[in-house]
């Protein structure tokens, strides 16, 4: 027996857990390719559908976020109650279907309905991913896990800008681009079913060394708790400063990121006279560097915490840099008339912005793993309700003022809120767990 244990102790752990999170990164990227497809195709849709005012464009963008937001808490509960593998696969296949169906729409109403369907079906992915993180990654790996889980946003936005502008240019049709994006989504959803497993023990590719590494790390942090949660279970947590700051910070961050994601294509075209090709290239550069910055932030967070640094010092420093750089970059961009400087400043603003992704790991880090799906679902519900309202507000701002200046100031102000809320989170104080 001792010989066997000795052999196992020398065995190199497999990296199945990281392969799963790379697949989640791919799913997240496709998620955002499908989301951003509307913004990329909007000039063509506006011309074809006869849409002239920015407020209608804002309302069409918000259709996705309303349904996505309303499904966040139910999706978090699904992640806590059912198998994550099944939820991820079903959600991906269904949202791919809605993306493809969008190509058949000939009215604003029908297109809005497909965006609503897209929002409903995409909603379970992030809560399910947060649940996977709690069962597959040790606490010192969750910073990188969070960045991979949430890294699909900038990566998908960057790739979507290039891919969709190329498809539209090549085929001369935004409709064909939508169909190709939808079918590709369905294919990746099926791949996820064949590779992802709910726990490390279920995966045949996990060797004993990797299993021991995961289980030991999780047990040292207090273990995982299996508990089926109800909607009302979140209510006692809403009196805690950490939870309120978590929700508020994520809402402010979402205002900045999703505001830029939705409106930067139109901003570059209308305020700086970019053509579609130039806009696609600029979007690719900005959001690809945002993705790279996000991954760097994850590595810094994990290595810094592994060195024994206090959690408050690590996360407060990273989140402060993220918020301040984003806010200053957006403010300077709004006051610049140079197209080149606009792209440079927005790129600087976006580079550390996604360090906010550590928010996904906070419930687990603060000792609320059994409520991770429900808390992150609530957090995402609030932020996406914000994201649903923001396109409408910005659309009316642009329509009333005739420029993007007020909108950019709005995003810079939201960055200040993101900073304040992040500083209020006490990472050294666990959440007070509520018992039935």
Where are the regions that the model predicts?
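Conserved MFS/SLC helix-loop-helix module at the cytosolic interface between two early adjacent transmembrane helices
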Residues: 70-109
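Extracytoplasmic gate region of multi-pass secondary transporters
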Residues: 38-39, 235-297, 353-356, 360
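Cytoplasmic helix-loop-helix junction between adjacent transmembrane helices
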Residues: 114-154
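Extracellular/periplasmic helix-loop-helix junction of adjacent transmembrane segments
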Residues: 39-70
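Helix-loop-helix hairpin linking two adjacent transmembrane segments in secondary transporters
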Residues: 149-203
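C-terminal transmembrane helical hairpin of 12-TM major facilitator-type secondary transporters
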Residues: 312-359
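Helix-breaking motifs and short loop linkers at transmembrane-helix boundaries and internal kinks
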Residues: 51, 83, 98, 104-110, ...
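Glycine-rich segments within core transmembrane alpha-helices of 12-TM secondary carriers
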Residues: 143-162, 168-169, 185, 290-294, ...
């Amino acid at each position: 027996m001792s010989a066997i244990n000795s052999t196992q102790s020398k065995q190199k752990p497999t990296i199945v857990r990281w392969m799963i999170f790379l697949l989640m990164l791919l799913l997240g990227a496709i998620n955002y390719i499908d989301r951003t497809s509307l913004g990329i195709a909007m000039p063509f849709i506006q011309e074809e559908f006869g849409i002239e005012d920015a407020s209608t464009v804002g309302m069409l963008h918000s259709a996705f976020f309303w349904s996505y937001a309303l499904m966040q808490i139910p999706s978090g509960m699904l992640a806590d109650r059912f198998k994550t593998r099944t939820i991820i696969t079903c959600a991906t296949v269904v949202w791919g279907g809605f993306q493809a169906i969008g190509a058949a729409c000939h009215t604003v109403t029908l297109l809005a309905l497909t965006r609503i369907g897209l929002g409903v079906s995409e909603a379970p992915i992030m809560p399910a991913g947060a649940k996977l993180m709690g069962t597959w990654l040790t606490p010192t790996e969750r910073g990188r896990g969070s960045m991979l889980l949430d890294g699909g946003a900038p990566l998908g936005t960057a790739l979507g800008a290039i891919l969709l502008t190329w498809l539209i240019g090549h085929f001369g049709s935004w409709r064909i681009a939508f169909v190709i994006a939808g079918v590709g989504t369905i294919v990746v959803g099926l791949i996820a079913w064949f590779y992802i497993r709910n726990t490390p023990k279920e995966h045949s590719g996990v060797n004993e060394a990797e299993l021991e590494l995961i289980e030991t790390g999780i047990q040292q942090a207090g273990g995982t708790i299996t508990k089926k949660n109800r909607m009302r279970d979140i209510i006692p947590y809403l009196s805690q400063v950490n939870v309120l700051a978590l929700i508020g910070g994520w809402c402010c961050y979402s205002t900045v990121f999703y505001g830029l994601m939705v409106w930067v294509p139109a901003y570059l075209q209308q305020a700086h006279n970019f053509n579609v090709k130039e806009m696609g290239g600029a979007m690719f550069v900005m959001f690809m560097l945002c993705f790279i910055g996000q991954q760097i932030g994850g590595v810094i967070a994990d290595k810094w915490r592994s060195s024994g640094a206090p959690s408050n010092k690590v996360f407060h420093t990273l989140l402060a840099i993220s918020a301040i750089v984003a806010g200053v970059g957006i403010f300077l961009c709004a006051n610049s008339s140079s197209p080149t400087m606009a792209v440079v400043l927005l790129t600087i603003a976006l580079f550390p912005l996604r360090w906010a992704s550590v928010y996904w790991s906070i419930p687990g880090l603060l000792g609320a793993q059994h409520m991770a799906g429900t808390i992150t679902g609530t957090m995402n519900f609030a932020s996406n309700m914000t994201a649903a309202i923001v396109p409408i507000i910005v659309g009316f701002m642009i329509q009333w003022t005739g420029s993007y200046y007020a909108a950019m100031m709005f995003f810079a102000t939201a960055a200040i809120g993101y900073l304040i809320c992040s500083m209020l989170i006490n990472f050294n104080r666990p959440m007070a767990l509520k018992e039935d």
